[in-house]
Design a protein with these regions (language model features):
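Cation-handling catalytic/transport regions enriched in His/Asp/Glu
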Residues: 1-201
Length: 201
């Protein structure tokens, strides 16, 4: 069964074991954080699942789409000009279905169209730092799709571990940038959101 899963993910056992080793090493600190979060929310015996996503800290900072766009283009353009240019194209050419509306599905996703070398991104942007992070995440998938443009069609299906690496990296780079100017309360909110989201990846 493991061999089949590894083949499907295009991953060797050594890579999987390295990932599990990193997870095991980080787990004690992550558990301590969630115990502390539980205490902060009034739970003495750990954090119940129903409060996993309960917000902590306080952030009144919101972003317009224009501010989110400028932040992402500047940050990712400096990191990788090709990624910054792809993001500019995504914003300017209408790749992104940005806002929530009646009848629209919740959440977010990205779908690539190989023949046209474009992607389509759906988000429900309401202006929070988490929404900007979600946008960065989905545009990470779009950039991964863009990088596959010279591959044969049969090689363009990205296995989940690789697909989530690109998008999670984008979130991490963005959060690192936001932390540079965050107040202590905003810092707590950003870090909590980041850690909580990682339990789902």
């Amino acid at each position: 069964v493991l061999d089949m899963a590894l083949a499907h993910s295009r991953m060797d056992e050594k890579t999987l074991e390295a990932m599990w080793t990193a997870i095991r090493e980080a787990l004690p600190e992550l558990r301590e954080y969630f115990k502390a979060k539980g205490r902060l929310l009034g739970h003495e015996n750990g954090l119940p699942f129903y409060d996993l996503f309960a917000p902590v800290g306080q952030s009144t900072r919101t972003y317009t789409v224009e501010e989110a766009r400028a932040l992402l283009l500047d940050l990712f353009g400096k990191f990788c000009p090709e990624m910054g240019e792809m993001m500019r194209t995504a914003f300017d050419e209408g790749w992104i279905d940005m806002y929530p509306r009646e009848g629209k599905s919740g959440g977010a996703f990205c779908s690539g169209y190989y023949a046209k070398n474009i992607s389509r991104v759906m988000t429900n942007f309401a202006g929070s730092a988490s929404d900007v992070s979600t946008l960065a995440h989905e545009l990470g998938h779009a950039f991964n799709n863009r990088m596959l443009r010279h591959k044969p069609l049969m090689m363009t299906e990205t296995p989940m571990p690789l697909a989530e690496t690109a998008s999670t990296f984008n979130e991490t780079l963005l959060i690192s940038q936001l932390l540079k100017t965050a107040t202590p309360e905003e810092e707590l909110t950003l870090l909590d959101s980041c850690l909580t989201e990682q339990t789902q990846t």
